[in-house]
A protein has these predicted regions:
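Short substrate-entry loop that stabilizes the transition state in hydrolases
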Residues: 81-82, 90-100, 105, 109, ...
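Conserved alpha/beta-hydrolase
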Residues: 107-127
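Conserved acidic catalytic loop of the alpha/beta-hydrolase fold
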Residues: 139-159
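A catalytic-pocket lid/entrance helix-loop region that shapes and gates access to the active site
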Residues: 170-172, 181-229
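Alpha/beta-hydrolase
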Residues: 216-303, 310
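Short beta-strand/loop motif that positions the catalytic acidic residue
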Residues: 308, 314-316, 320
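Conserved alpha/beta-hydrolase "acid-adjacent" motif
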Residues: 321-327
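Catalytic histidine-centered segment of alpha/beta-hydrolase-like enzymes
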Residues: 348-357, 361
Length: 379
């Protein structure tokens, strides 16, 4: 009997050791794959035949902005073209890994020199010693101003274009309020307006939809939160129930074919980042959500930001509830600007630049042709 027990224990131990060995091997393989996929260098821009475009730019840079070193990428098929500074969303979530993952031949970089900046506290610009005092809206505004001046000097421009998505659209509004003289025009994607109300509208939509399809699990999760409470939206709601249901119902980051796993993989396999940048992306997203998101929640642009000295153009997905399409429509109608416009993307949710990239590029070209002169002959 004792021999049988010992035999069973030995075999159980062997199985456990085998499982541990396999897990360790898998982890090592994943680390090696990630390391290989993290050279910290962007691929060169190529034409339709796969040939490198002469004179094109595809680079990673770090400079001091404000009081810390911050990183950004610059991509352009022709550096003489007009310049766009792209402000990512999140806050704390640079989009270039996702943009490149769905990139088509008709890309912004064919007509513009585009700077994708990792804002302070995330990705290349993550620093472990950054706290709430280092992450104010004014810090971001001043950083954007300084980076704009760097781009103007480097590329010999009197002005550039400013573009922002989600949180970046909120930041963009604040930037053009303070420094309108630096920009030809502002373009907001998924334009933030009154985000606290937007979150309430999104909650109501998800609750109604869950009731319509009789989805008890979703109703139970939503029932844990009160959209009229003072602390709404709570951090756990934002990271859990809200994100899950928005993406499931096609009203979040994208209308179709989106998963958080695909987003994570886009970031992890992004060759423009080093391993430390990928760690900084994850940690920075949490840092910004805890310290920056609520600046946007507490502000109502209908009251604080309505008069501008630069043209304002809004790109919004019809199905976007992550940032309300209805509120963005109202906002465009009431603001004062030298020129303004709303472009509705009828197949998109929150990311029309990635969901309908060809039309998005066409509209941006049209705007630039209005304010900058013809860039290329019309197709």
């Amino acid at each position: 009997m004792v021999l049988i027990i010992n035999w069973k224990m030995k075999n159980t131990l062997k199985v456990i050791l085998w499982i541990v060995a396999v897990l360790v091997a898998l982890i090592l393989i994943m680390v090696v794959v990630l390391w290989i996929a993290s050279p910290g260098k962007l691929p060169l821009l190529k034409d339709a035949e796969g040939k490198v475009i002469p004179g094109s730019i595809s680079e990673r840079r770090e400079i001091i902005l404000g009081d810390i070193e911050q990183g950004f990428f610059i991509r352009s098929e022709n550096p003489d073209n007009p310049v766009i500074l792209y402000l990512h969303g999140g806050p704390g979530s640079p989009e270039l890994p996702m943009i490149m993952a769905v990139e088509e031949r008709e890309r912004l970089e064919k007509y513009f020199t585009v700077c994708y900046w990792d804002q302070r506290g995330t990705g290349m610009s993550y620093r472990s010693n950054l706290g709430a005092d280092d992450l104010t809206v004014q810090h971001y505004v001043d950083d954007a101003r300084d980076l704009t001046k760097y781009l103007m000097e480097r590329f010999g421009k009197d002005k550039i274009y400013l573009m922002g998505l989600s949180w970046g659209s909120y930041l963009g509004i604040k930037v053009i309020e303070q420094y309108p003289e630096l920009y030809y025009a502002y373009m907001g994607i998924g334009q933030v307006t009154h985000q606290h109300l937007s979150e309430q509208l999104a909650y109501e939509y998800m609750l109604d939809h869950a009731n319509e399809v009789n989805e008890h699990k979703a109703l139970k999760k939503l029932g844990q939160y009160d959209p009229l409470s003072e602390g709404f939206p709570q951090l756990d709601y934002l990271m859990g129930t809200r994100t899950t249901l928005m993406n499931k119902y096609g009203i979040g980051i994208m209308r179709e074919d989106f998963s958080m796993f695909s987003l994570v993989m886009d970031v992890m396999m992004f060759r423009g980042y080093k391993m430390c940048d990928k760690v900084g992306y994850v940690r920075g997203s949490l840092l910004a959500l805890e310290n920056v998101f609520y600046f946007m929640i507490d502000d109502n642009l209908f009251e604080s930001s309505t008069n501008f000295d630069v043209p304002v153009y809004i790109f919004h997905g019809l199905y976007d509830y992550q940032v309300s399409y209805a509120l963005a429509t109202e906002y465009v109608n009431m603001i004062e600007a030298p020129a303004k416009g709303l472009y509705t993307f009828e197949k998109s949710a929150h990311s029309p630049n990635m969901e309908e990239p060809a039309r998005f590029v066409r509209v941006v070209r049209d705007i630039a042709e209005l304010h900058h002169g013809l860039i290329y002959p019309l197709d």
